[in-house]
A protein has these predicted regions:
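Short coil/turn segments that connect the beta-strands within blades of beta-propeller domains
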Residues: 43-45, 122-123, 177-178, 297-298, ...
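Blade-loop segments of beta-propeller domains
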Residues: 34, 60-120, 125
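Asp-box/WD-like beta-propeller blade repeats and closely related beta-sheet repeat scaffolds
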Residues: 96-117, 128-176, 184-188, 202-215
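Structural WD40 beta-propeller signal
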Residues: 29, 39, 115-119, 174-176, ...
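Conserved loop/turn at the beginning of each blade in beta-propeller domains
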Residues: 19, 29, 74-77, 97-110, ...
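Beta-propeller domain segments
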Residues: 1-16, 59, 71, 133-134, ...
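Hydrophobic core register within WD40 beta-propeller blades
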Residues: 36, 114, 173, 284-287, ...
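Predominantly a core beta-strand signature of beta-propeller blades
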Residues: 22-23, 88-92, 154-159, 272-275, ...
C-alpha cells in the first residue's frame, strides 16, 4: 500500500561483531520469519525456516486483501515453512500453507516456532500457531495450538488445541525427558482486559494457581464509567474475588494445566497431561534448556518481554528480563511476580508510572479525550500502577538479569564448543533483542544508541565458593546509533532480529523478521500515514549466519 523501505541485502553486511567473527546472509527475501530448525550433521544438513504470516495488527497486514486470496500459495501474509540446504538454496516449500479445507497453518497467524523433538537428529517436527494477529474479535480467543508437521509434505496433525490467545499466543518450544515445553504469553498487557484487547472483546488472563484479586479496578472510560478487575472479562468489577487456578473466564471452565503468562508442558506420549511448569510472567517468549553440565542445569532459561504503555493498566519504562524457571519440588509452578512485580520491583514504583500515550485506554477517543489532551486523565487515574492481586500466590523468584525497556527478548541459545572464540566462553548464551514497537519513548537518550535490534552475549562465570555471575555485553549490532537497518540507505544490517539458533556447523543463525513501521512518530517510512502503524514489509526478512573465522 505505497509503503517503501530501504532494503538491499546484496550489499556487504554492516553488522558490527567482535574480532574473529564474520556475518553473511544465508537466506533473504523472506516474509516475516520467526523460527528456524535444523536436520542433519555438520557435513550435510537442511534448514527449516518458519514464515509467520500476518503477525501484527495493521490494516496493511491483511491476508484477506491479497490479490490472489487467502489461500493463494504466494500470499505473504499467511504462514508457511521453507526448507533450504546447507548452502542456502531453497529445496522445498512453501509447506503448510493454509487451505480452504482447513489444512496447514491457521490463515491469520502468526506462526511462532518450529522444532524437532531430537534437535538436529530429527524426530517429530512441532510448530506453534494461532489466529491471534488481528486483536479485533473474539475469533482469536483460545485459537493457539501446537501441531506436528510432516517435514516432506507439510501435512498438519494438531497435538494440543484451544490454548489461550490474546495479546500473546503460544510461542516457543523446547523438549526434555519426554515432555514438550512451550511459552504461553499473557492474553493482556498487564493483567487487565482493556480497549487495546479487541475493544474489550478478548479473553482475560488465566491464573496458574488460586489467586485473590485486590480491591482495585482499572478504568477504560470516564464517561460512561467503565472499569475492570484483573483476571476478569472487560467491564466486570469483582474486587476481592477469588479466581481458581486454570479458570478460563471466556469459556467459564477449568482446564487442568492450562493458564497463561507461563511456561507449560505436556507429555509427548499423552497430550492431555498438561502441567504448569512456571508462571508469573507477562510474555515469556524465549525459552531454552541449558546443557546438562551447565551451572543453570535443571532450570529453563526464559527471556521475558515487559509491559507496554497501553491499555487499562498502562506502564512506562518497564525492563525486559532474563529469568530461570524451575518447577517447585511438589510439582507446582514457581512464580515470578507478574502482574504486580516488574523485574521484582513493585508495580507502584514511580519509575513505572505511565506518562500518557496514544494507546492508553483513557486516550481512546471516543469515549475519552484524544491524545495528548487525555494526559491529565491518565496521570489522575492510572498513577501509581495499582496492584491486580491482593497478595502473591507464593514466594516470588527474582530475575537473573534485566534489559532495556521495550528491547523485546525474543531468542536464546547456548553456544556449542565450536563457537567458543574470545570473547565467547564455554557455556555462554547468545540472545536476540527484537527492539521496541514505539508504545513508549526510546529507551536511550541520544547520542546513546537505543537498546534493541541486536544480539547480545552472556558469559556465566562461576568460581568455587562464589555466586554465579552473568557477564553481558554487545555481540552483534548495527553501526552505533542505527536501529532498524531499513531507515538508512546503503546499510545492510539487522531490522528485527527475532531468534537465534546454532546449526550443525557450529554457526549462529539469526532470524531477522524484517522491516516494520512502528507506533512512534519517527516511523522512517515513505508512504501515507493512514497505512500505519505496525506495517510489515514482505520480502525484507533475512536469515543471518554468524561464524567464527
Amino acid at each position: 500500500m505505497d509503503n517503501t523501505a530501504n532494503f538491499n541485502p546484496t550489499l556487504p553486511p554492516s553488522i558490527v561483531l567482535p574480532p574473529g567473527f564474520t556475518a553473511s546472509v544465508f537466506a533473504q527475501g523472506l516474509n516475516q520469519p520467526t523460527g528456524i530448525a535444523f536436520l542433519g550433521n555438520s557435513s550435510s544438513f537442511q534448514v527449516f525456516v518458519l514464515e509467520s504470516g500476518h503477525g501484527l495488527p495493521s490494516v496493511c497486514n491483511d491476508e484477506t486483501l491479497w490479490p490472489g486470496g487467502v489461500f493463494d500459495i504466494n500470499n505473504p501474509f499467511t504462514p508457511d515453512i521453507l526448507v533450504f540446504n546447507q548452502n542456502g538454496t531453497r529445496i522445498r516449500g512453501p509447506l503448510g500453507k493454509p487451505t480452504s479445507t482447513g489444512g496447514g497453518f491457521q490463515p491469520s497467524g502468526p506462526a511462532i516456532d518450529i522444532a524437532f523433538v531430537n534437535g538436529t537428529s530429527g524426530g517429530p517436527l512441532f510448530t506453534t500457531d494461532s489466529n491471534q494477529s488481528t486483536h479485533t474479535h473474539n475469533g482469536n480467543n483460545n485459537s493457539s495450538r501446537i501441531s506436528t508437521v510432516n517435514p516432506m509434505t507439510g501435512q498438519f496433525t494438531p497435538f494440543i488445541t484451544n490454548l489461550p490467545t490474546g495479546d500473546h499466543p503460544t510461542e516457543q518450544l523446547a523438549f526434555k525427558d519426554g515432555w514438550i515445553y512451550w511459552s504461553q504469553g499473557s492474553t493482556t498487557n498487564s493483567g487487565v482486559v482493556g480497549l487495546d484487547n479487541g475493544g474489550g472483546a478478548n479473553q482475560s488472563d488465566i491464573p496458574c494457581q488460586d489467586i485473590t484479586l485486590s480491591q482495585n479496578v482499572f478504568i477504560s472510560s470516564l464517561s460512561p464509567f467503565v472499569a475492570t478487575s484483573g483476571y476478569s472479562p472487560f467491564s466486570k468489577q469483582q474486587p476481592g474475588a477469588t479466581i481458581p487456578a486454570f479458570f478460563n473466564s471466556f469459556t467459564g471452565q477449568v482446564r487442568q494445566g492450562v493458564c497463561d503468562g507461563a511456561i507449560l508442558r505436556a507429555q509427548l506420549s499423552n497430550s492431555s497431561n498438561i502441567q504448569a511448569f512456571s508462571w508469573g510472567y507477562r510474555n515469556p517468549y524465549a525459552i531454552r534448556f541449558p546443557p546438562d553440565d551447565h551451572p543453570l542445569a535443571g532450570g529453563l532459561l526464559v527471556g521475558v518481554d515487559g509491559e507496554d504503555e497501553r491499555g487499562a493498566r498502562p506502564t512506562n519504562g518497564v525492563p525486559d528480563r532474563l529469568e530461570l524457571a524451575r518447577q517447585n519440588p511438589d510439582g507446582s509452578p514457581d512464580y515470578h511476580g507478574w502482574p504486580d512485580r516488574f523485574a521484582f520491583l513493585p508495580s507502584s514504583q514511580a519509575v513505572f508510572n505511565p506518562v500518557g500515550g496514544p494507546a492508553d485506554d483513557l486516550c481512546q477517543s471516543p469515549p475519552n479525550s484524544p491524545f495528548p489532551a487525555c494526559i491529565p486523565d491518565v496521570l489522575a487515574n492510572d498513577v501509581p500502577v495499582a496492584d491486580v492481586l491482593a497478595f502473591p500466590p507464593q514466594q516470588i523468584t527474582a530475575p537473573l538479569a534485566i534489559e532495556g525497556a521495550d528491547s523485546s527478548f525474543t531468542g536464546i541459545d547456548f553456544v556449542p564448543d565450536a563457537f567458543v572464540t574470545d570473547p565467547v566462553r564455554p557455556g555462554a548464551v547468545l540472545y536476540t533483542l527484537e527492539g521496541d514497537f514505539g508504545f513508549s519513548a526510546p529507551n536511550a537518550t541520544p547520542p546513546a544508541p537505543e537498546i534493541g535490534h541486536e544480539v547480545k552475549l552472556v558469559n556465566f562465570n562461576q568460581v568455587s565458593g562464589s555466586p554465579l555471575a552473568l557477564r553481558i555485553q554487545n555481540f552483534a549490532r548495527n553501526p552505533s546509533g542505527m536501529e532498524q537497518a531499513f531507515i538508512v540507505p546503503n546499510l545492510n544490517g539487522f531490522n528485527r532480529p527475532l531468534n537465534v539458533r546454532f546449526g550443525p556447523d557450529g554457526c549462529a543463525y539469526v532470524v531477522d523478521y524484517g522491516a516494520v513501521r512502528d507506533l512512534g512518530t519517527d516511523s522512517h517510512f515513505v508512504g501515507p500515514p493512514a497505512n500505519g502503524p505496525l506495517v510489515q514489509i514482505p520480502g525484507t526478512g533475512v536469515i543471518w549466519k554468524i561464524c567464527p573465522m
